[in-house]
């Protein structure tokens, strides 16, 4: 009888080509699957909740894999310990559970939260530099917060979806888009039912234009209306972005019960 193991994973994406396997570059998926093969003696495919891009980090990526009965795969806690003992320092298994066949890390998800960190310093502090973007110009955070509220709700986010991908629909719902300022760091908190390719980084890029005074906050309404990514600003760099957590419906709330119960999508 096969089992399905679910992992909660944190990683620093700096040295990786993203989550998904790439033939000529090292990915998070490849590192995990290589170590699982070393433990099990055969290839195990790991499926994530979504593909983070090169340089993007994660605090709460969720992934699952199937494996047949095997002495090393009977206890999720033991699996977590074995993986952490073999993984490099920039990938950590935060938790592991065993679940039923109905669960899927991608298709069972009901919400995701991304966080993008900005430094207000012209040169970020050394321990922040790999995890934040410093625009190096003065930002009006209040105007950015005002603008952000125009994107909350259900909209066609075609203007915020990078070209070169085909989408069955570009309509998404943002439950939260807030800016939290603490000392010299600003965190853009973006929670929604799903995200298009580079959507969060494109939203942050648009907010930066508002923050530096290039456009008024209402400009985001015009961007939504155009449905044309080519008229939008450049994407914010990847290294400021982190997948913070992924939420699932009952009974799959192992890793985010608190966040789910307090989220606006549950109201």
Curated annotation (Swiss-Prot):
Source domain of life: Bacteria
Catalytic activity from the UniProt record: uridine(38/39/40) in tRNA = pseudouridine(38/39/40) in tRNA
Active-site residues per Swiss-Prot or TrEMBL entry: 53
Function field: Formation of pseudouridine at positions 38, 39 and 40 in the anticodon stem and loop of transfer RNAs.
Biological source species: Chlamydia trachomatis serovar D (strain ATCC VR-885 / DSM 19411 / UW-3/Cx)
Record keywords: Isomerase, tRNA processing
EC number: 5.4.99.12
Quaternary structure note: Homodimer.
SUPFAM superfamilies according to UniProt: Pseudouridine synthase (SSF55120)
Gene3D superfamilies xref list: Pseudouridine synthase I, catalytic domain, C-terminal subdomain, Pseudouridine synthase I, catalytic domain, N-terminal subdomain
Record GO terms (molecular function): pseudouridine synthase activity; RNA binding; tRNA pseudouridine(38-40) synthase activity
Family, similarity comment: Belongs to the tRNA pseudouridine synthase TruA family.
InterPro entries given in the database record: PsdUridine_synth_cat_dom_sf, PsdUridine_synth_TruA, PsdUridine_synth_TruA_a/b_dom, PsdUridine_synth_TruA_C, TruA/RsuA/RluB/E/F_N
Name the record gives this protein: tRNA pseudouridine synthase A
GO biological process, one term: tRNA pseudouridine synthesis
Keyword rRNA-binding: no
């Amino acid at each position: 009888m096969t089992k399905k193991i679910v992992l909660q994973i944190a990683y620093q994406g700096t040295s990786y080509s993203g989550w998904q396997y790439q033939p000529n570059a090292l990915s998070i998926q490849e590192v995990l699957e290589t170590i699982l093969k070393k433990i099990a003696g055969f290839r195990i495919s790991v499926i994530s909740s979504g593909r983070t891009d090169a340089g993007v980090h994660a605090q709460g990526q969720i992934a699952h894999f199937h494996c047949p009965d095997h002495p090393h795969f009977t206890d999720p806690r033991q699996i977590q310990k074995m993986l952490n003992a073999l993984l490099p320092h920039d990938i950590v298994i935060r938790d592991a559970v065993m679940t039923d066949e109905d669960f899927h890390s991608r298709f069972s998800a009901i919400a995701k939260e991304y966080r993008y960190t900005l430094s207000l310093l012209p040169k970020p502090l050394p321990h922040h530099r790999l995890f934040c973007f410093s625009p190096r110009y003065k930002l009006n955070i209040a105007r950015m917060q005002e603008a952000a509220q125009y994107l909350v709700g259900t909209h066609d986010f075609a203007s915020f979806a990078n070209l070169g991908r085909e989408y069955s629909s570009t309509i998404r719902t943002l439950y939260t888009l807030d800016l939290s300022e603490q000392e010299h760091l600003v965190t853009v908190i973006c929670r929604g039912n799903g995200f298009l390719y580079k959507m969060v980084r494109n939203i942050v890029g648009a907010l930066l234009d508002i923050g530096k005074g290039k456009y008024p906050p209402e400009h985001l309404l015009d961007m939504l209306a155009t449905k044309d990514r080519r008229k939008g600003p450049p994407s914010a760099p990847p290294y400021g972005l982190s997948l913070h957590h992924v939420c699932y419906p009952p009974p799959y709330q192992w890793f985010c019960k608190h966040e789910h119960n307090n989220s606006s999508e549950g109201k």
